[in-house]
């Protein structure tokens, strides 16, 4: 284990203190050299004077500023041998020197050694200095640590990252797929650069702009681009950084942030994930959070307290606009809400072109094909897709990406890591029939999405996969399309039952059944696509953590609930009958496709449709995916 010098210092401090006391008590220097002359016996000062009067004292050495004497004496009581005796002298004995001189006693005075005084001074000062220094070090360390005692006076300061000249490295040309949002923010940039063009006609720029959209759609990237284009001071902070463990810190940080913003106007204040502090007040199972609500109230006050054209523009981002407080969204605070949604085909193509600039690709790679293959992908998903393809290209020791790496990367991003191929067995043949059942129904139904490929290569939790790619970006879905999807999802289970019998039906269709039940129930309760009629029977706002639907009962009667269940079962039952009929009518082509799938493990959509056409007619669809 490697220890830092700070850790070693902290551990050595108590050891040093113990060693210092041991040295002082046992090995430390004395103030004089009397220790080398200490006699084996002692006597009182009065007895010493008697020896002096009797003439037994021959020599006296004075130590410790005449406080101690070492006496050499000879007498009958001492066995007529020279004895060295220690005598403690009184503080005031002026007659002693006179008596010693009259008795012709050798007298010598020994002054204290200068080195002993130095050691004594150091001994007295060293420990306090070490103690004070150690405490100062610990205090400074805790002062610099996050959340330490020294931070108490700085809790109310804003933690916003400040850049006098926003060096985000991002401009509008680096942001693709959100053209509508870029047009909205172009006005903001123009105001920051040329405010007089707005004020001249009495216009007021919005004080706040709220970016709303799913994760990964580029909200934060768009804010960076605005700062990079405008070239003004840029403050950025996360909503969770306002609130701390101490009461009042959040409101204080809001005040400090807007004070700095006004001092540096014109500028941009970007608050990411504002739902952390802007959530609706007074809601939830346990009531409101007082500290968070104080912070929100201060934020509302600061935003509404701006003067008309101070040049401070607040931009916030969230993917939970439905939980924000209504007072935060009113005009005068966040005047505009800019939706940054998942890009359509053109948006995906533009995003891919941006991220492909620094990627080496073969000339045969079609970004248009990739864009059509990836409906529902966000900008972050597309960036990750090309990065995964680049990593796979390097792993395969290729110099440039091909469609093979991109196809594999799409499968990995959507379905997970590739597993070990299945061995030839009854289980593999059953899975093959299951997947071919999905694919052949999807190919023969007019309103179903076209098959992109069928594979037996496991990915994630799936032992086999059938890929369907929508013909376009579908924002509206018809009843026929939903029913076709239900029939297609039931195709795998129908194939298992028809080919292997009811007793051999497996659990492989569990996820399919979940999707089927969900789609059928939404047809009845949400979309009004059943015999019940055009009614919305879905519970509205049933989120107890936002104070919605607390203790609320059902909005319809038990009879209606029973009818809903009946309609759901009827829809699924009719679709299942149609799925089994298609499987029975196309058993021959299914057997051929299963044998081919077991042999190749993957059949591309074009090849699949070509084989099916040899046996039956296929409805015309928009097939745009080229074969990889």
Curated annotation (Swiss-Prot):
GO annotation, biological process: protein catabolic process; proteolysis
Topological domain ranges for the Lumenal compartment: 29-118
Cofactor(s) it depends on: Zn(2+)
GO cellular component terms listed in the entry, alphabetical order: chloroplast thylakoid membrane
Residue ranges of coiled coil: none
CDD domains per UniProt: RecA-like_FtsH
Record's keyword terms, sorted: ATP-binding, Chloroplast, Hydrolase, Membrane, Metal-binding, Metalloprotease, Nucleotide-binding, Plastid, Protease, Thylakoid, Transmembrane, Transmembrane helix, Zinc
Alphabetical list of InterPro entries matching this protein: AAA+_ATPase (IPR003593), AAA_lid_3 (IPR041569), ATPase_AAA_core (IPR003959), ATPase_AAA_CS (IPR003960), FtsH (IPR005936), P-loop_NTPase (IPR027417), Pept_M41_FtsH_extracell (IPR011546), Peptidase_M41 (IPR000642)
Protein location: Plastid, Chloroplast thylakoid membrane
Positions annotated to bind Zn(2+): 434, 438, 512
Binding site for ATP: 213-220
Family: In the central section; belongs to the AAA ATPase family. In the C-terminal section; belongs to the peptidase M41 family.
Subunit structure comment from the entry: Homohexamer.
Record protein name field: ATP-dependent zinc metalloprotease FtsH
Taxonomic source organism: Porphyra purpurea (Red seaweed)
């Amino acid at each position: 284990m490697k220890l830092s010098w700070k850790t070693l210092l902290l551990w050595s401090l108590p050891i040093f203190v113990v060693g210092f006391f041991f040295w002082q008590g046992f090995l430390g220097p004395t103030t004089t050299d009397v220790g080398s002359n200490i006699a084996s016996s002692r006597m009182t000062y009065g007895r010493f004077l008697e020896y002096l009067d009797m003439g037994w004292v021959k020599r006296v050495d004075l130590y410790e500023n005449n406080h101690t004497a070492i006496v050499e004496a000879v007498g009958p009581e001492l066995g007529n041998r020279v004895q060295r005796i220690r005598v403690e002298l009184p503080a005031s004995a002026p007659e002693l020197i006179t008596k010693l001189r009259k008795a012709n006693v050798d007298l010598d005075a020994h002054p204290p050694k200068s080195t002993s005084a130095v050691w004594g001074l150091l001994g007295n000062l060293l420990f306090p200095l070490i103690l004070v220094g150690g405490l100062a070090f610990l205090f400074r360390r805790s002062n610099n640590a996050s959340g330490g005692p020294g931070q108490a006076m700085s809790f109310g300061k804003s933690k916003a990252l400040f850049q006098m000249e926003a060096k985000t490295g991002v401009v509008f040309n680096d942001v693709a797929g959100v053209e509508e949002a870029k047009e909205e923010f172009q006005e903001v940039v123009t105001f920051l650069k040329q405010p007089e063009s707005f004020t001249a006609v009495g216009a007021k720029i919005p004080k706040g702009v709220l970016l709303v959209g799913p994760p990964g759609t580029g909200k934060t990237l768009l804010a960076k681009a605005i700062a990079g284009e405008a070239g003004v001071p840029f403050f950025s902070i996360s909503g969770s950084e306002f609130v701390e463990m101490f009461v009042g810190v959040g409101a204080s940080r809001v005040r400090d942030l807007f004070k700095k913003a006004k001092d540096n106007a014109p500028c941009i204040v970007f608050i990411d994930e504002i739902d952390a502090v802007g959530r609706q007040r007074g809601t939830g199972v346990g009531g409101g959070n007082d500290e968070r609500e104080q912070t929100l109230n201060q934020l509302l006050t600061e935003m509404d307290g701006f003067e008309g054209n101070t040049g401070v523009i607040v931009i916030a981002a969230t993917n939970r606009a439905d939980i924000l407080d209504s007072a935060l969204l009113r005009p005068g605070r966040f005047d505009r809400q800019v939706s940054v949604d998942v890009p359509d085909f053109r948006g995906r193509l533009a995003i891919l072109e941006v991220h492909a600039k620094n990627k080496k690709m073969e000339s045969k790679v079609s970004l248009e094909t990739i864009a059509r293959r990836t409906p529902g992908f966000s900008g972050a998903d597309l960036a990750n897709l090309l990065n995964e393809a680049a990593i796979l290209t390097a792993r395969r020791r290729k110099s440039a990406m091909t469609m093979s790496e991109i196809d594999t990367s799409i499968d990995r991003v959507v379905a997970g890591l590739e597993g070990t191929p299945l061995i030839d067995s009854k289980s593999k043949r059953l899975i093959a029939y299951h997947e071919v059942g999905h694919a052949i129904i999807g190919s023969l139904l007019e309103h179903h999405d076209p098959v992109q490929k069928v594979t037996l290569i496991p990915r994630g939790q799936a032992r086999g996969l059938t890929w369907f790619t929508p013909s376009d970006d579908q924002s509206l879905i018809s009843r026929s399309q939903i029913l076709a999807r239900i029939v297609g999802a039931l195709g795998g289970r129908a194939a298992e039952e028809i080919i292997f019998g009811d007793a051999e039906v497996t659990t492989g269709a569990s996820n399919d059944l979940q999707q089927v039940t969900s789609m059928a129930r939404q047809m009845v309760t949400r979309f009004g696509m059943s015999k019940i009629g055009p009614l919305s029977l879905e519970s509205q706002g049933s989120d107890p953590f936002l104070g919605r639907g607390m203790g609320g009962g059902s909005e319809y009667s038990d009879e209606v609930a029973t009818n809903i269940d009946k309609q759901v079962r009827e829809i699924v039952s009719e679709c299942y009958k149609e799925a089994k009929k298609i499987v029975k009518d196309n058993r021959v082509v299914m057997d051929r496709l299963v044998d081919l799938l077991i042999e190749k493990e993957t059949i591309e959509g074009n090849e699949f449709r070509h084989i099916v056409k040899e046996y039956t007619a296929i409805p015309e669809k928009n097939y745009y995916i080229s074969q990889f």
